Amino acid sequence: MRLTFALCLLSLFQIRCVGKTTQCKIETTLGIIEVELYPEKAPNTVANFLKYVDAGLYANSSFFRACTPENEAERDIRIEVIQGGDLPIEKEMDPVAIETTEQTELLHKDGTLSMARDTPNSATCSFFICIGEQPSLDFGGARNPDRQGFAAFGQVTKGMDVVKKIQGQEEDDQYLIEPIKILNITRID
């Protein structure tokens, strides 16, 4: 009996020690993608993404780009991702200093949610989801010449089939001919 009680207490303690995550739902015209965000590992990047979520700014945006083995064939460093969150420039908020994968230890694996960017700390609203392992997007990776990598901050927990459906849409030079509408992105309680 004491052993059972001790094991129950230990289980409760372990549950409380697990890092806190934030859950979000990405509703698209092709289905729902659920993600968990890691604010304890990537606080600035998660806060940046949630500013857009909480303001409802992703409603009626889209997934507009899909990188595939076929349309990346000419590049030296190939990736497989879908990119979304295209907003009019007037709705973009100021970029913030975001964490690299060297700082967070969150790597670009299958289903990783990450912020798109041009130069370091230029990420605003655009994000992408990895299909398969994408080490060239991590800190030190060669996809971006500055080798700073991209800011991974979450993981798909449900809906990778939807991610792959989006990736499979007809495209022209990586840009979807008919972008897939993001109906909304909301937090899941």
Give the ranges of each region predicted by the language model:
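Sec-dependent N-terminal signal peptides
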Residues: 3-12
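Cyclophilin-like peptidyl-prolyl cis-trans isomerases
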Residues: 15-189
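Intrinsically disordered, low-complexity Ser/Thr/Pro-rich tracts
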Residues: 1-4, 27
